[in-house]
Amino acid sequence: MSAKNSKDRTETFYARTGKRIFDLVLSIPSLIILSPVYLLSAILIKLDTPGPILFSQDRVGQNGKPFRLYKFRTMVKDAAKIGPPVTTADDPRITKTGRLLRKFKVDEMLQVMNIVKGDISVIGPRPEVKKYIDIFAEEYKDILKIKPGMTDYALIAFRNEEDILSRFQNVEEGYIKEVMPEKIKLYRQYLSEMSLRTDIKIFFQTIWEILVK
């Protein structure tokens, strides 16, 4: 992707204004529609293991600005203190309820709140933790020009990321050396194709991957 093409896409009317309208049109009704799912998830988490219902983590947003990303807690309390930020399918820190929520990406659905707040978009490169972005600082210069998103090409391609990481003896090393470079390629692909048509396509592809396949 050329620098010129990237610049053109990030400075279009859709990138500057249209995406925010698209985000609000989808996210505000979603908060109402998903409220029963949120309530049921909260009850199951509370009944399953001790600890908070929600999990939040610092991620890097547009132009490098940090923000708090929200999810339903799917791991044991203080899981971040006893393991790496990335997880595998057989990670013992994942709770019974957590496995169910992760299977259908229900834990991620709470990020609709981040969309309404303006931290992220519906569609865009997935928000990453700073330690990994620092490793790929040069590659992320263009990627951080736009808001991260709830879903994108990379989320679809790595739908079973935890299973992929299970193959590596050193999970974090596998994520950095094998998974991250491929994700960055897909982030750049999105950056070069960003448009309303592309966002609608990715939105429905995500629904197909999670609910149908």
Question: Where is each model-derived feature located?
Answer:
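A hydrophobic, helix-centered structural microdomain
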Residues: K4-A79, Y190-K213
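C-terminal terminal-structure detector
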Residues: K7-R9, F13-Y14, K145-K213
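Residue-level "hotspot" positions that anchor or transmit function at local structural transition points
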Residues: R9, L31, P85-T88, L144
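Positions in alpha-helical segments
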Residues: S27, F55, T95-R99, K131, ...
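Short, hydrophobic secondary-structure boundary micro-motifs
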Residues: S41, P84, I123-P125, K130-K131, ...
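Short, glycine-rich, amphipathic interfacial segments at transmembrane boundaries or analogous
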Residues: F55-R93, A154-P181, K185
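A short, structured surface patch at a secondary-structure boundary
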Residues: T88-A154, K201-F203
